[in-house]
Amino acid sequence: MVGPRTRGYAIHKLGFCSVVMLGINSIIGAGIFLTPGEVIGLAGPFAPMAYVLAGIFAGVVAIVFATAARYVRTNGASYAYTTAAFGRRIGIYVGVTHAITASIAWGVLASFFVSTLLRVAFPDKAWADAEQLFSVKTLTFLGFIGVLLAINLFGNRAIKWANGTSTVGKAFALSAFIVGGLWIITTQHVNNYATAWSAYSATPYSLLGVAEIGKGTFSSMALATIVALYAFTGFESIANAAEEMDAPDRNLPRAIPIAIFSVGAIYLLTLTVAMLLGSNKIAASDDTVKLAAAIGNATFRTIIVVGALISMFGINVAASFGAPRLWTALADSGVLPTRLSRKNQYDVPMVSFAITASLALAFPLALRFDNLHLTGLAVIARFVQFIIVPIALIALARSQAVEHAAVRRNAFTDKVLPLVAIVVSVGLAVSYDYRCIFLVRGGPNYFSIALIVITFIVVPAMAYLHYYRIIRRVGDRPSTR
């Protein structure tokens, strides 16, 4: 679609089909390669249902984010939504925790990449399973951060290359797995789906991991859905480019369900093929790329792992570029010190990059590089946004402010879906076993506890102090709206 003209040139905005493709590419990442083993172990033969539930929830929250973008035109960030609805007091916390969450997400991705790389490059060594602070795995992690910094020095061109590389890698790996897997299933009449029962064990349901209520399929499905949701992360960013889209009010609410449905269909096909090839092998595998464990042919298995590795590398490059910019955006708006936004001669915000990289390394170290716990943390950390943004949308829909007067209200997307998102988000959040974050081998994990307190309490508190100190210095009063 051609938009308005600027200096004689037509501005081409993203049409409906482009928005759908953007959504699909934003969601499909490393998650589908990494999560099947844990999901099968938690849900057994009901593992596909966990991905269906995760997809439905992702679709609901994505539509909530897209609807909020109708009221806030500046950008699609959760920081902007909550600031517009509740003022800086709430917006600052959401903005800071969003930056922290992005840093954690990058750390999880980097941990997965390093583990996979060590397994592929050194299959005879146990380096990929190391839990110690000082290990080959930690050194490789630091080296990988250095490589990502070097790539960042090349600027946007390198990021475009990384996105293209990631897309090619994941498309090739998934296509090869599905086509090759179906060929094996049909020609050799393979059906190992029922072996999922041997991998399944009912998980106790406990509120916050403390008060145990019962043990059964429901509790297992709740935890499996949280893990499966990691494969859908990225859906919350679909609406970020709303200003670049043609008629986002009309196209986003239609495009997002199609994108989620398409991704869900791909995931279900991939998971079904994997479970038919060998559910028990996937669940029992110690490899990072769980899907490959179902394949008996070594060459075919290597192709899938390398494709996933290429995909993870590209995603890490993009994360290393985007996550530090969240800190610089907060610094530019006065929430954080301006030195966080200072860039070197290569246009890299070194202070923000250092903060992001430190958090990216700290959390995997605190959780001993445990893939299941890292996946859960990456999802749970996002629930701050998943709960507050729907509340912000309800407030924006009720607002009588002039800037929101022209927005056409819709009771279903403005009230019903946000309420559903809030209820489900709270339900999943309280279902998570937080002991895996705060405890290690039965005792307190002081490293992890200190990190959580510093990142989610101390850092936001410092941001508030800095912001209000700046306000007092200029002699203005902060908005409480």
Swiss-Prot record:
Transmembrane segments: 14-34, 46-66, 90-110, 134-154, 167-187, 218-238, 258-278, 303-323, 377-397, 411-431, 446-466
Example GO molecular function: transmembrane transporter activity
Topology class, membrane: Multi-pass membrane protein
Key words, A-Z: Cell membrane, Membrane, Transmembrane, Transmembrane helix, Transport
Keyword DNA-binding tagged: no
InterPro entries assigned to the protein according to its UniProt record, in alphabetical order: AA/rel_permease1, APC_superfamily
Main location: membrane
Record localization: Cell membrane
Recorded GO CC terms: plasma membrane
Keyword Transmembrane helix part of the UniProt annotation: yes
Annotated function: Probable amino-acid or metabolite transport protein.
Family from the record: Belongs to the amino acid-polyamine-organocation (APC) superfamily.
Entry protein name: Uncharacterized transporter MT2031
